[in-house]
Structures are given as structure tokens and as C-alpha cells.
């Protein structure tokens, strides 16, 4: 038997109500655990809270927004404007650095403080879910946000020899364009004035940005493996008084392997969401 899934409306729907909330997606997204950007993108890039809630039309989105209350809407609007501005600052800083230096080497070091601040600031998205001003599940939000923080703090920040890798530039560019698009989409949706270009960008840019971001993250983690194996960083060896062991090297390998099943599944899910939002298609999904 098939299951009919009605198309989401073009007005932003659940994404607008979720506004300050995560991720997916992505993943993507993005940088998720266990698959870094993969799990994140599932709700961030497709704008559907990982499929948890989809609006059937713009009136439903407006109704949800009213239920948030005036103060919550004001705060979410401010939050999304701030995050849009923050990622715009990062974009400008990256362009200026490359124009002045003519190389990517040293780029991460030059923008790391701003990157860490705004990516860590996204922890508020978990709080938004906890207090109920966005409809995303706390678990989904937690995975999405913590995965990005994992990539920033526990990989790129902690393993300095990899900071000049070209792969770092790949995921930084993908993240930056994605977040500018995502947060501006949420902002305009909350203001009930969503330009078509922003909606179009939201549901088209991921086609390139998601694979680029995932590739950048995978290559960065891969580049970190020799250093992690040599130094044993973040690993816990036996014997110890807690009788517990942990090998960060193998943890990173498992993280990389998790992309194999997650990436295709989530990417095609996002493509289906794109067809629903931009073309109003009714998708028939077969139940096995």
C-alpha cells in the first residue's frame, strides 16, 4: 500500500514556526553525531524539522506563530537576525582574507573566534525546544547543534595541524552559505514577508552545499586521524580506576562510517521536501 503525503506550502510552514530551531538538518545539517553533517541536514536543509512537523499551508504557519506569543516571536526574530548577521560577518571575513592573502592558509585562525561564538550560541536552539517556543524535539535539536559543535571544538579547534587543510575551507563555505540562507529564511518567515528568492535558495542551494559540506567534514576528520592516533588525544586507556576505555581514533572512524548510510537517505529525503515546497507535488511513498 502507498501513503499519500500532501505537499508543504510555499510560505515556509513548519520551518517558520521552528525558526530559531535547528538544525537537520545535516545536516546538515550539519556536522552531526554520529554522522556529523549528515543527520543535521535532515532537518536544517529541508526545513521540515527532520519531518517532525510540516505545515499544510501558510495559514497553519500563521496560526502556529500566534500561539508562540508576542514575546517569543520577538525573541525568535531577534535571534535569527543576529545569527544571519553573524554568519554574514563570517562570509565577509573569509572573502576579505582570501582577497588580501591570496591563500586559504591561516583562514581558519583568522575567523575562528567568530565561528566558535556563533556556532556555540546555537545552543540556545536546544533551550528554545525545552521551553516550547519551537516545535522541534529536544533530541533532534540536541543532535543537530552538538554535532556542529563537535566538528568545531573537538576536531578543528583541538587538532591544530589540520586547520590549514583545504577541506576545512570546504565545510566552512558550505556552512556559511547554508546558515545565511537558513536564518534569513526563518527571519522573513516570522515577519510574514518571505521573498521568493530566499525560499528558492533555501530549497535549492543544499543540492550543492550539502555534498560539499559533507565532503569537507569527512576529509577534515580523515586528515585528523594520524595526529589523533599518534597522540592518543581524548582517549582513555586501561587500566584506570574507573575500568573504562575510550579510543578517540576509532570513534572518529565510526563517525566517518556513519555517513555511508545516512548521506544518501537524507539527501534524497531533502530532494523530496524540495519538490513538495517549490512545486506543490503530492509524493507517494511506498511502505515496505
Swiss-Prot record:
Q: Positions of the region Disordered? A: 1-59
Sorted UniProt keywords = Developmental protein, Endoplasmic reticulum, Fatty acid biosynthesis, Fatty acid metabolism, Glycoprotein, Lipid biosynthesis, Lipid metabolism, Lyase, Membrane, Transmembrane, Transmembrane helix
Its post-translational modification remark reads: N-glycosylated.
What ranges does the Cytoplasmic topological domain annotation cover?
1-75, 132-141, 181-203, 270-288
Q: What class of enzyme is it?
A: lyase
The active-site annotation reads: 210, 217
What is the name of the protein in this document?
Very-long-chain (3R)-3-hydroxyacyl-CoA dehydratase 1
Lineage of the organism: Eukaryota, Metazoa, Chordata, Craniata, Vertebrata
Amino acid at each position: 500500500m502507498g501513503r499519500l503525503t500532501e505537499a508543504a506550502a510555499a510560505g515556509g510552514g513548519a520551518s517558520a514556526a521552528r525558526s530559531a530551531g535547528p538544525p537537520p538538518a545535516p545536516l546538515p545539517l550539519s556536522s552531526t553525531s554520529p554522522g556529523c553533517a549528515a543527520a543535521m541536514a535532515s532537518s536544517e536543509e529541508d526545513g521540515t524539522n527532520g519531518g517532525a512537523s510540516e505545515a499544510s499551508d501558510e495559514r497553519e504557519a500563521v496560526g502556529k506563530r500566534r500561539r508562540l506569543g508576542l514575546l517569543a516571536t520577538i525573541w525568535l526574530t531577534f535571534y535569527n537576525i543576529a545569527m544571519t548577521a553573524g554568519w554574514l560577518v563570517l562570509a565577509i571575513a573569509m572573502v576579505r582574507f582570501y582577497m588580501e592573502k591570496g591563500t586559504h592558509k591561516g583562514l581558519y585562525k583568522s575567523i575562528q573566534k567568530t565561528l566558535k561564538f556563533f556556532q556555540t550560541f546555537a545552543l540556545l536552539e536546544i533551550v528554545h525546544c525545552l521551553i516550547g517556543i519551537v516545535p522541534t524535539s529536544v533530541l533532534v535539536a540536541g543532535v543537530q547543534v552538538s554535532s556542529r559543535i563537535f566538528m568545531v571544538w573537538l576536531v578543528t579547534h583541538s587538532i591544530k595541524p589540520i586547520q590549514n587543510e583545504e577541506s576545512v575551507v570546504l565545510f566552512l563555505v558550505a556552512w556559511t552559505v547554508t546558515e545565511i540562507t537558513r536564518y534569513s529564511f526563518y527571519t522573513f518567515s516570522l515577519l510574514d514577508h518571505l521573498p521568493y528568492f530566499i525560499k528558492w535558495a533555501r530549497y535549492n542551494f543544499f543540492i550543492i552545499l550539502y555534498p560539499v559540506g559533507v565532503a569537507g567534514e569527512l576529509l577534515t576528520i580523515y586528515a585528523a586521524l594520524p595526529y589523533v592516533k599518534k597522540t592518543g588525544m581524548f582517549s582513555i586507556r586501561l587500566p584506570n580506576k574507573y575500568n573504562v576505555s575510550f579510543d578517540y581514533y576509532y570513534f572518529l572512524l565510526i563517525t566517518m562510517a556513519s555517513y555511508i548510510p545516512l548521506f544518501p537517505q537524507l539527501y534524497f529525503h531533502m530532494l523530496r521536501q524540495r519538490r513538495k515546497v517549490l512545486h506543490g507535488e503530492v509524493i507517494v511513498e511506498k511502505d515496505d
